[in-house]
Regions:
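Non-catalytic accessory regions flanking glycosidase/transglycosidase catalytic cores in CAZymes
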Residues: 1-67, 83-91, 355-385
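An active-site-proximal structural segment forming one wall of the substrate-binding cleft
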Residues: 39-70, 75, 79-166, 187-198
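Short capping micro-motif at the N-terminus of alpha-helices
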Residues: 9, 16-18, 295, 413, ...
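Short acidic-hydrophobic surface loop/beta-edge motif
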Residues: 5-8, 136, 421
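C-terminal outer-membrane/trafficking sorting elements
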Residues: 388-437
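Extracellular glycoside hydrolase catalytic/binding regions
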Residues: 24, 28-31, 36-37, 41, ...
Length: 437
C-alpha cells in the first residue's frame, strides 16, 4: 500500500517494484502463441494463458538472473471489442462490448492475474486501449473508464487480492479539458476523481495509479488540485522515454538536469511513490540509418534496435538511473518483455538472457535496456532484501511460525505454491519471508 512517499508491504517494509508490461495480443507478441486470425474467441484463451505462464516463469527466474517483481497487464481491446464492429484505433471505444469485457475478465484477464501472482509478481492492470488525444470531463471516454473499472473493482477475487493487484486508471492522456472543452488546470483532477470514487464505491481498497497529461509526463496540475481518496492508497503512474522531460536524450543527458526536470514535471515524487509504467531504450540501428519516424512530440527518430524510444544506456540510461536512485521511490515496468529478456531463446532452450541480442552485431548490446535492466533489477532487488526482511533466523530465536497464502489468509500447512512465512522472535520482533513449496 501507499504510505507517505513509499510503497510498503504487509510488514511495513519499503518496496520498490521493477518488472515488465505486456498485452495478450498476438501481433504485439510476434505471433508466438498463434498465427494471424481474424478475431479472438474463447478457443484462443488456452494457448494465450500457456504462453504468458512461460513469460512469468522467465521474468522471475532468479537463478538465471531475472528479478522482476511486478507485471503490468493491458486488458487488450482485441478481446473486448465486438468483432462485427470496426474500431479505427486503440482510442476508439465504439466497438467496445461490456458483455465481452465481463466474459474475458473472468476467462482471460483474471486467470492471467492469478498466474502472475502465483509466480510472485504484483500486478498493475490498465484498461483496454488508450485515451483519445483530447478528453473532456464527463465525456464518453470518462464514462467508459468508470464502467470498465466498476466491473473490475466489484469482482470478488479482485477485491480479496487488492493488496497485490493495483489499478492504472488510463493509458496516456494527452490533453484534458473541462466539460465545455475549455482548458483548466483543474481538468485532470475533475476527469479522474470520479473514476477513483467509482472504484472505491465497489469496495476495492488496493492501490490506484493516476495518470497525468502529455502521454503521462505532466503532473503539475495535480499539485494544485490533488486527487483525494477515501483509502488514502493512491499515487501516480508516469511514462518515461528519451526526448521527454526537457528533451533529455543521449546528447542532453546531464544527471542533475534530468533529476530537476523530472521533479518539475512530476512534483509529487517527493511526497508519493511513483510507478513508471512504460520505459525502454536502445541505440540507433546502424543498418537503418536512412529510415525513421516522428515521435509524439514531432521529433525525428531514427530506427533503433527494437524499442519504442531511442537512447543508449551509457548516456541517457545512466541519467535515468540517476533519477531513479536519487528519489528512491520510483518503480518501473519496461514496455515489452522482449526488451527485458530474449523470449525466443527462452521458448527454445529455457535460457533467460537479456533482450536485444541482435545488438551484439554492432557491439551495442550493453547499450540496450535489456542488458541494463537485467543487471539493475537484480542490484535493486538485492538492496531491498539485504535489510533482513527475507533473511531467515536461527531456530533458537523463533517463538512461533505462521504461514499465509498469497491472499494474506492464514493456513495450517502450506501445500504447493507461494507462501509468506511469519516468524515471531524472542525479542518481540517478527520476520517475514516468501517461500515456494
Amino acid at each position: 500500500r501507499v504510505e507517505g512517499k513509499n510503497l510498503v508491504d504487509a510488514n511495513g517494509k519499503i518496496v520498490v517494484l521493477h518488472g515488465v508490461m505486456d498485452t495478450p495480443n498476438r501481433y504485439f507478441n510476434g505471433w508466438r502463441w498463434q498465427q494471424w486470425k481474424a478475431d479472438y474467441s474463447e478457443s484462443d484463451i488456452q494457448p494465450c494463458l500457456e504462453y504468458f505462464s512461460k513469460q512469468f516463469s522467465a521474468i522471475t527466474d532468479k537463478e538465471q538472473g531475472a528479478y522482476c517483481t511486478v507485471f503490468r497487464l493491458h486488458m487488450d481491446p482485441c478481446w473486448t471489442n465486438d468483432p462485427t464492429k470496426k474500431a479505427e484505433n486503440e482510442a476508439d471505444i465504439s466497438a467496445f462490448s461490456m458483455a465481452r469485457y465481463r466474459l474475458y475478465l473472468q476467462k482471460l484477464y483474471i486467470p492471467l492475474i492469478k498466474d502472475a501472482i502465483a509466480h510472485g509478481l504484483y500486478v498493475i492492470v490498465r484498461p483496454p486501449g488508450v485515451c483519445p488525444q483530447d478528453i473532456s470531463v464527463g465525456d464518453k471516454y470518462n464514462r467508459y473508464l468508470k464502467a470498465v473499472w466498476k466491473a473490475f473493482a466489484a469482482d470478488e477475487y479482485i477485491r480479496q487480492n487488492s493488496g497485490i493487484i493495483s489499478i492504472e486508471l488510463a493509458n496516456e492522456p494527452v490533453r484534458a479539458h473541462l466539460s465545455d472543452g475549455s482548458n483548466s488546470d483543474q481538468a485532470l483532477h475533475d476527469y479522474f476523481q470520479p473514476v477513483v470514487d467509482e472504484i472505491r464505491a465497489q469496495g476495492f481498497k488496493g492501490i490506484i495509479w493516476v495518470p497525468g497529461a502529455g502521454y503521462q509526463s505532466q503532473y503539475q496540475n495535480y499539485a494544485k488540485h490533488p486527487i483525494t481518496d477515501s483509502e488514502d492508497n493512491f499515487s501516480y503512474a508516469v511514462h518515461v522515454y528519451s526526448g521527454w522531460y526537457g528533451n533529455m536524450t543521449d546528447k542532453n543527458c546531464n544527471h542533475d538536469t534530468f533529476i530537476r526536470n523530472f521533479k518539475s514535471q512530476v512534483p509529487m515524487v517527493e511526497t508519493k511513490p511513483i510507478m513508471v509504467t512504460e520505459i525502454d531504450w536502445s541505440p540507433e540501428d546502424p543498418d537503418k540509418a536512412n529510415e525513421g519516424h516522428y515521435n509524439e512530440w514531432g521529433q525525428w527518430t531514427q530506427p533503433n534496435l527494437g524499442s519504442w524510444a531511442t537512447a543508449s544506456t551509457s548516456k541517457w540510461g545512466l541519467a535515468w538511473k540517476a533519477v531513479h536512485d536519487h528519489f528512491g521511490n520510483i518503480g518501473m515496468t519496461i514496455t515489452h518483455p522482449q526488451e527485458y529478456y530474449d523470449i525466443d531463446e527462452y521458448l527454445k532452450t529455457g535460457k533467460v538472457i537479456p533482450g536485444f541480442q541482435n545488438a551484439k552485431k554492432h557491439n551495442l548490446f550493453e547499450e540496450c535496456c535489456g542488458y541494463a535492466c537485467m543487471n539493475w533489477y537484480k542490484e535493486w532487488y538485492m538492496k531491498q532484501t539485504d535489510t533482513g526482511i527475507e533473511q531467515k533466523v536461527n531456530d533458537a530465536e523463533v517463538v512461533a511460525t505462521y504461514y499465509y497464502n498469497i491472499a494474506g489468509v492464514k493456513v495450517n500447512k502450506p501445500e504447493k505454491g507461494i507462501y509468506v512465512v511469519k516468524q515471531l522472535l524472542k525479542d518481540g520482533k517478527a520476520r517475514s519471508y516468501k517461500v515456494c513449496y
